Amino acid sequence: MSSNNDARKNQPLINDQIRFRTMVVIDDHGNNLGEMNRIDALNLAASKNLDLVVIAKKGNIPVTKILDYGKYKYEQKRRQKESRKNQTIIKVKEIKIKPMIGEHDLKVRAENAKRWLEDKDNVKFVIEARGRMCTKDEFIVQAYEKFIDLIKDYGTVVQANKKVSNYRYETIIEPIKK
């Protein structure tokens, strides 16, 4: 039931739903007609066979516009659909390794990263150094450099080997823009 109320709250007030005594009225051509009382504004909209719609509730006096409400709703839906179509969703895929990873295992993970970068997904490369490996920075750097060398033709490093905790290093790689 609350979702029904939420949908109603998002809808602007139209015609008889408007209970304000006075309001600023804008006609169907965009001209500001100034402040009017409710009855005169509703009569003016009815005489043009259009609707009176509250477009802004600023302060005590709302701003209303005379327009075709069905056309107005259609235009709003079309604009929302257009903006959703223009959005690009960026996915982030994650690869997690240990510093002492085998050569073949690293190549397999690099192939996965290449495939994801070709699909225009970002890749988060994580090195987890547990136990005494936390103190062996040379192994961490070596694993990082090997991986980056394997995928350098497919992506660019945005955030390089950042230490996010005592044992976790993260690198973010974006696909190369063509």
From Swiss-Prot:
What keywords would UniProt list here? Cytoplasm, Initiation factor, Protein biosynthesis
Secretion signal span: none
- Ranges in coiled-coil conformation: none
Q: Which residues cross the membrane?
A: none
* Superkingdom: Bacteria
Q: Where in the cell is it found?
A: Cytoplasm
Q: Give the record's GO biological process terms.
A: ribosome disassembly
Q: Name one GO molecular function term.
A: translation initiation factor activity
Short name of any one Pfam family annotated for the protein = IF3_N
The cellular component terms of Gene Ontology attached to this UniProt record, alphabetical and capped at eight, are:
cytosol; membrane
InterPro entries to which the protein is assigned, alphabetical: T_IF-3_C_sf, T_IF-3_N_sf, Translation_initiation_fac3_CS, Translation_initiation_fac_3, Translation_initiation_fac_3_C, Translation_initiation_fac_3_N
Q: Which Gene3D superfamilies match?
A: Translation initiation factor 3 (IF-3), C-terminal domain, Translation initiation factor 3 (IF-3), N-terminal domain
Question: Is Coiled coil one of the keywords?
Answer: no
Principal subcellular localization: cytoplasm
Q: NCBIfam families this protein is in?
A: infC
Protein family: Belongs to the IF-3 family.
Subunit description: Monomer.
Its annotated function is as follows:
IF-3 binds to the 30S ribosomal subunit and shifts the equilibrium between 70S ribosomes and their 50S and 30S subunits in favor of the free subunits, thus enhancing the availability of 30S subunits on which protein synthesis initiation begins.
HAMAP family this protein is in? IF_3
Official protein name in the record: Translation initiation factor IF-3
Species whose genome carries this gene: Ureaplasma parvum serovar 3 (strain ATCC 700970)
Q: What is the lineage of its organism?
A: Bacteria, Bacillati, Mycoplasmatota, Mycoplasmoidales, Mycoplasmoidaceae
Q: Which gene encodes it?
A: infC
